[in-house]
Amino acid sequence: MKTSNFKIYKGDNGVAICIYPPRDWSGARFPALEPPRKLFFARKADQINDEEYEKRYRDEVLSKLDPKIIYETLRGQVLLCWEPAIFDDRGNVINSGNGFCHRHIISQWLFENLGIIVKEWDPLDEIPKDKSMPLF
């Protein structure tokens, strides 16, 4: 399992975990991980901050789910929403484009409950590393 956003991930095993996937989206959706509309719009309108959003998302969504079942169900999938990710020079996610994204809350929740690290999908991971190629 990995996470990403619709703009950069175009593979076949993407799963939308947002309320509004792209209009042309024909891939899978996983509504159980979508933020409640009221919570989504409160954050979008700056009525709540990131900390309050995370608390409520955990209370209203994640607390009702079994992390083991979620992981087993979505194993091998890429969880998709809209926010772009920002990486440090080592390839670690610093935050999303506006500093916040619920897919990273899900990643953290899976780590806290199962010890599983769910990384942000990196297109460079898909490049085959052929060690037999000559350098010259």
Locate predicted features.
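Residues lining hydrophobic/aromatic ligand-binding pockets adjacent to catalytic sites
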Residues: 1-136
